[in-house]
A protein has these predicted regions:
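Aromatic- and glycine-enriched beta-alpha-beta binding-site module
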Residues: 61-125
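Short, basic/low-complexity N-terminal boundary segments at the transition from targeting/disordered tails
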Residues: 25-28, 66-78, 149-155
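A short, compositionally biased
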Residues: 43-46, 90-91, 165-168
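Short, extreme N-terminal leader segments that mark the start of a protein/domain
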Residues: 1-65
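Short acidic/polar mixed-charge low-complexity motifs
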Residues: 56-59, 70-71, 178
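A contiguous, surface-oriented mixed alpha/beta subdomain in the mid-to-C-terminal portion of proteins
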Residues: 96, 101-234
Length: 234
């Protein structure tokens, strides 16, 4: 079960310390993790990037694929088995959530898990006087920037949808000599992309969309990387 999430405060968490780790036990069973557009290039060097559709809202979210099956993360191990770690994983155990008394106001919350929290080793969150430490301020600033970038990512995805570039596809793969299918994923249609008028390409260049688009397309090659990781686990 997910660890409980509580608003971060000096009263409840004044003695808490964060023990930095590249173990990332909280994503051991995560097959996919969401991405922001700013990390497409780094992610594409090691992981496939696809889009998943929310069946209730119809909205698309870019994600990194970490495994071939539900509950499988091939990058999970004693140490993370990739040079790049998606930002949403790195921000753990912190997150921003709407405040209960004011849903329009975001508040910093912490996932109370034994994996990274303790009272003796690591980075303190508060001083003896109950003030935020420099470490906590840095984590808050990074998370705030990430939150801002989620809106830029939504704008990027909305543009792709507006131009009808995202299409559902079934990928036929071969892993360990066995044929597999990945269903329910969506990709940018390269033929539709190349058929766009010049003014659309100029607009994408102006907005900085071309780089993440091509990073996504190139990331399809990383299914071979996933297959190699799968071979090592069987």
């Amino acid at each position: 079960m997910p660890a409980p999430v509580r608003p971060l405060n000096a009263v409840d968490h004044g003695k808490v310390k964060i023990n930095p780790s590249r173990h990332f036990a909280h994503v051991e069973k995560e097959q996919i993790v969401p991405l922001i557009v700013h990390e497409f290039a780094s992610t594409a060097a090691e992981m496939p990037i696809v889009f998943v559709k929310n069946s209730e809202t119809g909205e698309f979210t870019p994600v990194a694929i970490l495994g071939f099956e539900q509950g499988e993360n091939l990058f999970y191990g004693q140490q993370w088995l990739a040079s790049y770690v998606p930002a949403v994983i790195m921000h753990h155990p912190f997150a921003l959530m709407p405040a209960q008394d004011n849903p329009e106001q975001m508040q910093l919350v912490i996932s109370e898990t034994d994996e990274v929290l303790n009272g003796t080793e690591g980075e303190a969150l508060f001083t003896e006087a109950g003030e935020e430490t420099q470490y906590l301020e840095q984590r808050k600033n990074a998370l705030g920037k990430y939150f801002e970038n989620t809106f830029i990512t939504k704008g990027f995805v909305n543009f792709l949808v507006e131009k009808a570039l995202i299409v559902e596809q079934t990928l036929n793969l071969e892993v360990n000599g066995q044929k597999r299918q990945l269903n329910g994923i969506h990709l940018i249609d390269e033929k539709k992309l190349n058929a766009l008028p010049d003014e659309d390409f100029l607009e994408m260049k102006k907005r900085g969309y071309l780089s993440p688009i091509y990073a996504h397309l190139l990331s399809m090659q990383q299914f071979n990387n996933l297959a190699k990781l799968k071979n090592k686990t069987t």
